[in-house]
Amino acid sequence: MPNHITNILTITGDEQEVQKCLAEIKGQGEDQFIDFNTFAPMPKELENTQSPVKIISQKEYDEQEARIANNDLTDIEKQWGFSRGITKEMSKRFKEEFGADNWYDWHLANWGTKWNAYDQISEEGDNVITFDTAWSTPFDAIQTLSAKYPTLSFNVRYADEDFGHNVGEYTLEDGEETYGNVPDGGSVDALRMAMDIKGNEDYYLTDYLSNDADEGENFTNSLIQLAHEKEFLEEGYPVFVLEKLKELALADEQFERVAEIEKHIESKPAEIDEDEE
């Protein structure tokens, strides 16, 4: 399974143009607020290909296509999908025409990520869309979208579930990156940004604080330990982390945990930076 990347896309500019863009990128599903295929469509010829590509003879290809046309597939193939082989000649032509001979390589080259967007959150007509992608943020897909709407600004903030790593922010306008910020993995800035992005959905912390008690306690203790790392004390990060934990524990009425967190907060002199207040 891949690492899931949380992406928060904000589209700004002329309201009429923003709404036009939102209507174009919306997928077929009720909760599919962004579908990369609507503005950066993968060629039909690459659908259901294999990665790495499977080269077969022309005879095998004809037999394969006949099976597909007649729906003569095994139960496993019907359930999990049928991966098509292609001929050597097709592979060469696809590379020349599309730059890739299979879906995976094409996605990476044109979307910047393995799959289409999933686990999406937004409201109808809202200019902010939160969604997940596999392994990486879809920089190339959003770059293509921004080139189609040159008067709009597309800002993306993203964070890996590998907390504090593969996290950053960029803005694209008219197909060009006008702003970028990728803090060093594991740094205070990266951890702050990741907590802010994941916290927008009460995702990263609440999953652990609200579900399995043992996992929740282990996670709380690990963050407390992280908060007290010497290198973070001068940055105000300890209290930033612990106050967030306290807020979530109070919401879940976990009062014993609240008391434990308060004890750790009081034991350290570090204060929240003025910009956190």
Range-by-range predicted roles:
Residues 1-245, 255, 270-277:
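Intrinsic low-complexity, intrinsically disordered or marginally ordered coil/linker segments
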